[in-house]
Amino acid sequence: MSDRPFTLADLQRILVEAAGADESAGPDDILDTTFALLGYESLALLETGGCIEREIGISLDDDTLTDALTPRELIDHVNERLAAARVA
């Protein structure tokens, strides 16, 4: 499990690996843009979630992944799960 917060840079890297994200989009371009507008459907988010789980060693449920509307929401949820896992 990671001992540092999950960041937008982490998410962008994983999106590129898992779903072929546009690497040229900057943080200001995507943080609060919906995944739908960024071109990601639920299957791409589930694949991204699997990569996050393997990389940082936490469990994410499918509903959380598909309910996150923006990268900011997903990052916040991942960091909440990380914090909870560190305490447990």
Curated annotation (Swiss-Prot):
Modified residues (O-(pantetheine 4'-phosphoryl)serine): 42
UniProt-listed Pfam families: PP-binding
Domain Carrier: 5-82
Database matches in InterPro entries: ACP-like_sf (IPR036736), PKS_PP-bd (IPR020806), PP-bd_ACP (IPR009081), Ppantetheine_attach_site (IPR006162)
Keywords: Antibiotic biosynthesis, Phosphopantetheine, Phosphoprotein
Involved pathway(s): Antifungal biosynthesis; monensin biosynthesis
MF annotations from Gene Ontology: phosphopantetheine binding
Residue ranges of coiled coil: none
Post-translational events: 4'-phosphopantetheine is transferred from CoA to a specific serine of the apo-ACP-like protein.
GO biological process: antibiotic biosynthetic process; secondary metabolite biosynthetic process
Function: Acyl carrier protein.
Protein name in the entry: Monensin polyketide synthase acyl carrier protein
